[in-house]
Amino acid sequence: MNTPTIERAIKESHNARAAIVRGDASGYLALFSEADDVTLGNPFGPFGRGRKNVEERLALAASKYRDGRNASVGFIAQYVSESLACVAEVESAEAKVAGGAEMTKVSVRVTSVFRLEAGNWKLVHRHADPLQIPQ
């Protein structure tokens, strides 16, 4: 069996981040597990628990961003076992946020947990906190 690597799933999450700051949540929707134990915490509201709730939270987050660009990721740590992986990163981009007209630098601390499901690494938890002080 040719199992996709965790590195590929992480790259897909970086692509999803670049898309969501342009208002497009489809990358995260594809990457999140279909299982009902998924969770999402982001700066725009309380934690989402369960696939349907996570979909709603992703749509809300995407609606808060426009015209995103210059997405980048700073690696902090990665822990991988046979079926689970945890990644800590700092993600940055520029975007118009919450209806604002000006481009704003947005940096968040992110913890992502992936699970190997049917040969594919799927996102099961993502938590992003805004950085108040540049790292």
Mark where each language-model region is:
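Outer-membrane beta-barrel domain signature
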Residues: 99-101
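Residue-level signal for tight coil/turn positions that link beta-strands
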Residues: 82-84, 118
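A solvent-exposed, acidic/Ser-Thr-rich amphipathic alpha-helical stretch
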Residues: 4-7, 25-80, 90, 104-105
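Hydrophobic alpha-helical segments of small multi-pass membrane proteins
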Residues: 76, 93, 109-113
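Short, low-complexity N-terminal intrinsically disordered segments enriched in polar/charged residues
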Residues: 1-31, 83, 135
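Generic short beta-strand segments
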Residues: 90-96
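Short beta-strand edge/turn micro-motifs at domain boundaries
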Residues: 107-134
